[in-house]
Amino acid sequence: MAIVKCKPTSPGRRHVVKVVNPELHKGKPYAPLLEKNSKSGGRNNNGRITTRHIGGGHKQAYRIVDFKRNKDGIPATVERLEYDPNRSANIALVLYADGERRYILAPKGLKAGDKVQSGVDAAIKTGNTLPMRNIPVGSTVHNVEMKPGKGGQLARSAGTYVQIVARDGAYVTIRLRSGEMRKIPSDCRATIGEVGNSEHMLRVLGKAGASRWRGIRPTVRGTAMNPVDHPHGGGEGRNFGKHPVTPWGVQTKGKKTRKNKRTEHFIVHRRTKK
């Protein structure tokens, strides 16, 4: 994997920084694991915009990724690594001994020809999935379940990981990249290693059009609008002299939005400020 800085042959290429991985498959994805992925344009079923700055972009097919990794006791061989337009991480196509193929998240260091396995008896090796009660304390894992059997929900983006810091009976304590420490049932599964493609954060799109290819529309500042369009709008010069709010007058930039007291007691330590 290499970081390539493009030559300034045009204004749109001048600032582009790409991540090039020669190990990625250059052909088409595995068709039986594809689904149609329709774009919403940020609209709900009434046709109203519920999420701004979404629209357009290149047509994409959804890759069905196995986050549960529940095919226990059957070894699988990594056939190839692939690009996935729906996530920052790369994915791996694995062939199980019984002939079934599945997509999994590609951990760091995984390559074509490697063997992976799931279940209680799986070895502590990159790409293998086990219940967290069977994973040694101090191990780095990803694709972590929060409810047994639900499938991985934590640490699925490129370069992310979770560390197991303690085990106490029915729960294990994990440390997230944010600094938060929380308890999770020890029957929940996790995959050994960290998610690959950690260089994803170093890429530079270089031009507005690259965002449009990804379905991201421009974001207009409230202070650049008229008073009829935004609470920050209008005035002489660039000032709005009030606390930052959304276009609908709700406080933003730092206002707490978490309302999930049901799981508060699982959080041992809050995330730390960066």
Curated annotation (Swiss-Prot):
It comes from the Bacteria. The keyword Lyase does not apply. GO terms for molecular function: rRNA binding; structural constituent of ribosome; transferase activity. SMART domains: Ribosomal_L2, Ribosomal_L2_C. Residues 39-48 have a biased composition (Low complexity). One of the primary rRNA binding proteins. Required for association of the 30S and 50S subunits to form the 70S ribosome, for tRNA binding and peptide bond formation. It has been suggested to have peptidyltransferase activity; this is somewhat controversial. Makes several contacts with the 16S rRNA in the 70S ribosome. This is Large ribosomal subunit protein uL2. The gene is rplB.
